[in-house]
């Protein structure tokens, strides 16, 4: 008899039960499995890594052999598959002990296992991606106030380095690098939107922290220079450029990108930034109001309504 195709409405995979829907899966920081605000015990690092691997491929079947390779890499023990199954049983028991029907979440399905998550709000990664994509779309259309709300919401999901308690596993390192790129993109676009809305003063401290953590990330330096300049701190903008230039020269032997050098020369000559800021101040910034309000028409009280999380 052929295998029944997976369907979210199939009884063994239904996640509409109140208890199952209350489970939260978090990877943007140490791995967490929460039930109504209570962290559930996840066991040894290898057992947590099995859950992490399933969570990164949520709603898809992960082969047992793929789990073995991810956990033990090049030197799995002879009974590795049996050990993986033991980890799965332990995780199911943890869910069951918390009052959750584990059959609705952790499913055995050839050639391995599937972690079922029926609601995107149950996973911090899904919430981050959804808010990020909405923010980038709003930013591309020039709706910068709307972009700020989405991008700030995306960053609220982060608690620390991706799967920070499992960084010794190669699959975590690879995933973390890719996702960190997304996080930095969100920070960059959030700074751009805030500067467009006249809130450079709010993002400058955050940008300073970010360039200290990511000294080669020229897109962050660009926003920092622009933020200082439009906030009438020309000397600080010039200093930021020289800090970047020294870092790149001493550690990589390269010059800043042409766009960064062009921005620096405009700052030296005290030229207007119409190509970088004027373009956005002509755009609408509030989708919800529907009145096409421009940035220059925002009052100071309007600007104060922008997310304080920017700081």
UniProtKB/Swiss-Prot annotation:
Disulfide bonds: none annotated. Changing residue 112 to A: Has no deleterious effect on the transcription of the moa1 locus. Keywords: Activator, DNA-binding, Transcription, Transcription regulation. Pfam families: BTAD (PF03704), Trans_reg_C (PF00486). CDD domains: BTAD. Changing residue 181 to Q: Shows reduced transcription of the moa1 locus. The keyword Transcription regulation applies. SUPFAM superfamilies: C-terminal effector domain of the bipartite response regulators, TPR-like. InterPro entries: AfsR-DnrI-RedD_regulator, BTAD, OmpR/PhoB-type_DNA-bd, Sig_transdc_resp-reg_C-effctor, TPR-like_helical_dom_sf, WH-like_DNA-bd_sf. Belongs to the AfsR/DnrI/RedD regulatory family. This is Transcriptional regulatory protein MoaR1. It comes from Mycobacterium tuberculosis (strain ATCC 25618 / H37Rv). The lineage of its organism: Bacteria, Bacillati, Actinomycetota, Actinomycetes, Mycobacteriales.
């Amino acid at each position: 008899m052929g295998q029944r195709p997976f369907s979210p409405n199939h009884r063994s995979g239904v996640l509409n039960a109140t208890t199952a829907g209350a489970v939260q899966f978090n990877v943007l920081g140490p791995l967490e499995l929460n039930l109504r605000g209570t962290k559930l015990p996840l066991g040894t690092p290898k057992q947590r890594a099995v859950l992490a691997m399933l969570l990164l491929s949520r709603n898809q079947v992960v082969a047992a052999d793929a789990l073995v390779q991810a956990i033990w890499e090049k030197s799995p023990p002879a009974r590795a598959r049996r050990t993986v199954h033991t980890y799965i049983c332990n995780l199911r028991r943890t869910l069951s002990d918390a009052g959750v029907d584990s059959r609705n979440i952790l499913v055995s399905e050839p050639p391995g296992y599937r972690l079922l998550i029926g609601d995107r709000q149950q996973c911090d990664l899904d919430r981050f991606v959804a808010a990020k994509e909405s923010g980038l779309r709003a930013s591309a259309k020039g709706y910068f106030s709307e972009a700020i709300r989405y991008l700030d919401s995306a960053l609220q999901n982060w608690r620390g380095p991706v799967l920070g308690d499992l960084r010794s596993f190669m699959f975590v390192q690879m995933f973390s690098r890719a996702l960190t790129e997304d996080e930095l993109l969100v920070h960059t676009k959030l700074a751009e939107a805030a500067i467009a809305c006249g809130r450079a003063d709010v993002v400058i401290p955050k940008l300073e922290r970010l360039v200290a953590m990511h000294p080669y990330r020229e897109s962050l330096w660009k926003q920092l220079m622009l933020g200082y300049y439009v906030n009438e701190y020309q000397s600080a903008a010039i200093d930021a450029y020289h800090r970047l230039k020294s870092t790149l020269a001493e550690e990589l032997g390269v010059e800043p990108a042409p766009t960064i050098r062009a921005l620096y020369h405009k700052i030296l000559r005290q030229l207007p930034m119409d190509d970088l800021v004027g373009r956005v101040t002509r755009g609408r910034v509030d989708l919800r109001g529907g009145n096409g309000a421009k940035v220059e028409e925002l009052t100071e009280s309007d600007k104060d309504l922008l997310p304080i999380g920017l700081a």
